[in-house]
Amino acid sequence: MNYLASLAGLALSVLQAAPALAKEGDTLRPFVAYTRNYDSNLYRLAKSEQVPGLKLSDQFEVLSAGLNVDWQPGRQRVIASASKNWVRFSRNTHLDYSGSDLQLKWSWRLGNHWSGQVGATESATQSSFSDVSLPINNQVTRENQFADAEWQFHPRWHVGLGTARSTSTNSTLQQAPSDYEDASVSATLGYTTPKGSTLRGQLRRVDGEYPNRSPSLFVDQAYSQTEYNLLGDWNTSGKLVAHGRIGYVQRENDTLSQRDFSGLNGRLSADYFPSGKTVLNWAVYREIGNTDDFNASYQLSTGTSLGGAWLATSRLTLRANATIENRSFEGDTGVVVLGTPQRDEDSLTGSLSLSYAPVRMATIDAGLQAGRRDSSIDDSDYRFHSVFVRVQAGF
């Protein structure tokens, strides 16, 4: 791990030069960052699952470097970013890995009535241990390509079409059955109010498959999903911005109809700016989604979150956030596992962080997070707390 710290020290030694290198309006903005982390329960295991000799707590460091691009030729805009990170653990060295994040988006305009976006993303990172409590180094590569176009046929009305394709690939054989591919198409009809708020009706169709799954009586290899959504964005005043989505989702599996599900989805979020130095964020949601549990065909997630940021001085920012969520695993698959009820889980997480900008192009962040999950399945309970310190410089 020492070589990462040495590289980080070399990069961060140019902090004082950062203001001279970066200029307002620069199209290209390179950056480098170094983060030191501690986690008390790395694998998110319950006490009953803890194995002697397994190193649950650990410190790890992350060295990141990348480039952000924001180019605006005329009425067009191209936003791109590329970053690479190296993660090294103190005790669980078998988890060491190198990740990446690539993004490219072109926001285009043609005349006064046509606009849209074309883009692609790719990321490689370690999978979460929250639901797969295996001490293995599984890396997930996610790719996404998308394109959409919108025609404003009236000062208040517009229609749009979009398409997207996504893939997710796991690096280990144990997680290969979770690999998936999906393709989607969508159509929208929108209305803009005189004050700038928008309402949109959306019809979306998704076809997906799990290419590495063998035929099974418990999980399917392919599905089709249809969504009917009503979307809204409101700017009610100079201090309040809100976003809403309510819809109905219907999922049909290729062969196992007992795993089909349908239901209501919804999310409401708002940003409130009581002053020029403070922002509050709030969200509440109800979302239905797929699960691979043998005795449940879907999971229903309901929750709320509250966060805020306070600019204490021109250099110092304080942030806090709390989230409460319930996940209920429901649906009759026809499979009964004796002694294993359907999962029902309550999660609570909270975080607090402080950000200091000693010079314009550099920040120093420190924070802590704590959380717990209580489940109807004893082995799915866990507790954790974590701490981090991060230094980043832009050039």
For the regions a language model picked out, list residue spans one by one.
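Cleavable N-terminal export/targeting peptides
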Residues: 1-25
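Gram-negative and organellar
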Residues: 21-395
